[in-house]
UniProtKB/Swiss-Prot annotation:
Function: Encodes almost entirely the C-terminal domain of poly(A)-binding proteins (PABPs). Plays a role in normal seed development and growth.
Annotated tissue distribution: Mainly expressed in flower buds and in siliques containing developing seeds.
Gene: MPC
InterPro entries attached to this UniProt entry: PABP-dom, PABP_HYD_C
The protein's name in its UniProt record: Maternally expressed PAB C-terminal protein
Species in which this protein is naturally found: Arabidopsis thaliana (Mouse-ear cress)
Ranges for domain PABC: 15-92
GO molecular function, one term: RNA binding
Extra facts: The MPC locus is imprinted. Only the maternal inherited allele is expressed in endosperm.
UniProt GO BP: regulation of endosperm development; regulation of translation; seed morphogenesis
Amino acid sequence: MNRLCFFNKVVKVARGDSPPFDLASLPPKEQRDLIGETLFFMVEELEPQFAPKITGMILELDQDKVLHLLVTPKAFKEMVKEAMEVLAHSFLQQMKIARGKRC
C-alpha cells in the first residue's frame, strides 16, 4: 500500500507490494488513474453526491493544474465550488428546456 499526502492527510493507494514511487515514473494512464482515485476521495469529502461528476470535470483540466489543486486546499475547494455552480447552471438549463417542451 502506497500513500500520498494531500492536505496534511494520508490517502492510501492500493498498488500491491511495490515500493514507494515517483508519479512521473508511471505511465500516463497509471498517473491519470492514481490522480483520479486521489481526487475522488478528496471531492467525496466535500460533495459526496456529485463526486464522480466533479472528479471527471477536474480530470479534464491540464495535469499541471490538477496537481496544483491536489496540494493547494484553497484552490481545490474553490474548483469544487465552481464545478458545483456549473452543474447547478446546467441542471437549471435542462429544466427550462424540459418545461418548454411540455407546453
